[in-house]
């Protein structure tokens, strides 16, 4: 289930997962918004290897991500991010994204030739089920018991004009 709340400052979103079955249910979730912003600033402590062989491998401990530093057509998989990212437009607009700790992972995507980027808070890394089955406990994959429920929220606040004016 998804719950949206729009107010004068921005948008709040809550995702709710419930296991209605009678067996344990592995799951992960996230949101996948597209933005026309040119840059995104965030801090993360882990960069996962790309899924595609066409994408470069890199290792950085703390990073500020911008469209220019991302490889077009590649997903950048991050973990241990601070749950905050700020998107910047060339005209001074900003969007502050804040996510619950349940969204411990983040994907940043740029498409070849596109004028957008995706900043996607997620509960798990790509291929989490296979990685977890191979013994990697850092993937964020969760298992819900029958009848169990899990939820997480995030907030997007938009600011026109003056850079740095967003409450964080």
Language model region names:
Residues 128-138:
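Short beta-strand and strand-turn-strand segments in soluble, beta-rich domains
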Residues 1-3, 139-144:
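Beta-strand-rich interaction surfaces with strong enrichment in secreted/lumenal proteins
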Residues 20-22, 38, 159-161:
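Short coil/turn motifs at secondary-structure junctions
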Residues 24-26, 33-102:
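Active-site/ligand-binding surface loops and adjacent short beta/alpha elements
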């Amino acid at each position: 289930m998804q719950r949206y709340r729009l107010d004068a400052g921005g948008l709040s979103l809550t995702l709710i997962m419930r296991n209605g079955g009678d067996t344990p249910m592995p799951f992960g979730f996230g949101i996948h918004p597209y933005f026309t912003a040119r840059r995104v600033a965030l801090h993360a402590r882990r960069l996962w290897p790309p899924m595609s062989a066409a994408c470069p491998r890199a290792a950085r401990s703390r990073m500020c991500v911008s469209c220019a530093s991302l490889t077009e057509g590649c997903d950048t998989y991050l973990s241990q991010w601070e749950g905050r990212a700020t998107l910047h437009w060339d005209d001074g607009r900003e969007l502050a994204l804040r996510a619950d700790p349940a969204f411990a992972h983040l994907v940043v995507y740029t498409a070849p030739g596109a004028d957008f980027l995706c900043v996607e808070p997620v509960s798990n890394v790509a291929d989490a089920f296979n990685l977890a089955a191979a013994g990697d406990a850092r993937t964020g994959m969760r298992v819900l018991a029958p009848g169990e429920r899990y939820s997480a929220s995030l907030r997007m606040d938009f600011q026109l004009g003056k850079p740095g004016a967003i409450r964080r």
